[in-house]
Curated annotation (Swiss-Prot):
Quaternary organization: Heterodimer composed of CysD, the smaller subunit, and CysN.
Protein's job: With CysN forms the ATP sulfurylase (ATPS) that catalyzes the adenylation of sulfate producing adenosine 5'-phosphosulfate (APS) and diphosphate, the first enzymatic step in sulfur assimilation pathway. APS synthesis involves the formation of a high-energy phosphoric-sulfuric acid anhydride bond driven by GTP hydrolysis by CysN coupled to ATP hydrolysis by CysD.
Annotated EC: 2.7.7.4
Pfam families assigned: PAPS_reduct
GO biological process assignments: hydrogen sulfide biosynthetic process; sulfate assimilation
Keywords: ATP-binding, Nucleotide-binding, Nucleotidyltransferase, Transferase
Domain of life of the native organism: Bacteria
Family: Belongs to the PAPS reductase family. CysD subfamily.
Name of the protein this chain belongs to: Sulfate adenylyltransferase subunit 2
Organism: Geotalea daltonii (strain DSM 22248 / JCM 15807 / FRC-32) (Geobacter daltonii)
Catalytic function, reaction form: sulfate + ATP + H(+) = adenosine 5'-phosphosulfate + diphosphate
Pathway it works in: Sulfur metabolism; hydrogen sulfide biosynthesis; sulfite from sulfate: step 1/3
Length: 301
């Protein structure tokens, strides 16, 4: 008698199939590890896909040098515990030129330290496929992107020239220099991710849990004072509030939400009641209309 899979089991099976398909079809895949909750789920699925062997590809983190300190500590611990090779790439030219979110703005900073940094790493190590944790429910440009997303030799994405995806059949053919970005969590929602983390007891960065943290209110967002590089503007004062993060990125560009949810069941309950996107807290999404789609066309994940 066949067993009916639950909703989460169906999502898990689809994601594991996608991960295995990439390993079977590509010569040199890599998993982008941004240290957030989606990366945590994706890494967990990859470990399941090849258990008891480790995943047959490295992790890649594009370090902008502005991530939360707790994220970097968590990244190093997880890589060591999983026994995986961790490649950390920094755009040294950007560092040399002093590119920062404060002095150059979020758009230029993201382009130099994230997009260009990612393209440098993919070219340097000659990866032909890269896993990412993006989901279709996050943002409108991601909603229309394929699971196997073709990139030109310049890493560009053309939303008007996407390959058909019928059922679970994926076109993996590329020419030398071209690559594919692969999104195993495309069909997951934010709530699915949290419920799966709870079900599988997946470790996540403590910043997702509510705690009293030092923040400043800036441009309608609560920005955490993570180190002494955050300079206060006139009239700003540091406040200590109970906050958590729904999404994690570079700390000067990521807004916290006031919350007392310090357990997974409480976070899930919040998700059931919220009516705003998790990416409302990401300043880079507010640069201009169609901001994310423009970034993706230029090579952003």
């Amino acid at each position: 008698m066949s067993k009916t899979l639950t909703h989460l089991q169906q999502l898990e099976a689809e994601s594991i199939h996608i991960i295995r398909e990439v390993v079977a079809e590509f010569a040199n895949p890599v998993m982008l590890y941004s240290i957030g909750k989606d990366s945590a789920v994706m890494l967990h699925l990859a470990r399941k896909a090849f258990y008891p062997a480790p995943p047959p590809f490295p992790l890649l983190h594009v370090d902008t040098t502005w991530k939360f300190r707790e994220m970097i500590q968590f990244r190093d611990r997880m890589a060591a515990e999983c026994g995986l090779d961790l490649i950390v790439h920094v755009n040294e030219e950007g560092v040399k030129n002093g590119i920062s979110p404060f002095t150059h703005g979020s758009a230029l900073y993201t382009d130099v330290m994230k997009t260009e940094g990612l393209k440098q790493a993919l070219d340097k190590y000659k990866f032909d496929a890269a896993f990412g944790g993006a989901r279709r429910d996050e943002e409108k440009s991601r909603a229309k992107e394929r699971i196997f997303s073709f990139r030109s030799a310049n890493h560009r994405w053309d939303p008007k020239n996407q390959r058909p995806e019928l059922w679970n059949l994926y076109n993996t053919r590329i020419k030398p220099g071209e690559s594919i970005r692969v999104f195993p969590l495309s069909n997951w929602t934010e709530l699915d991710v949290w419920q799966y983390i709870h079900l599988e007891n997946i470790p996540i960065v403590p910043l997702y849990y509510a705690a009293v943290r030092p923040v400043v209110e800036r441009d309608g967002m609560l920005i955490m004072v993570d180190d002494d590089r955050l300079e206060l503007k006139p009239g700003e004062t540091v406040q200590h509030k109970s906050v958590r993060f729904r999404t994690l990125g570079c700390y000067p560009l990521t807004g916290a939400v006031e919350s007392t949810a310090d357990t997974l069941p409480q976070i899930i309950q919040e998700m059931l009641l919220t009516r705003t996107s998790e990416r409302q807290g990401r300043l880079i999404d507010h640069d201009q209309a169609g901001s994310m789609e423009k970034k993706k066309q230029e090579g952003y994940f």
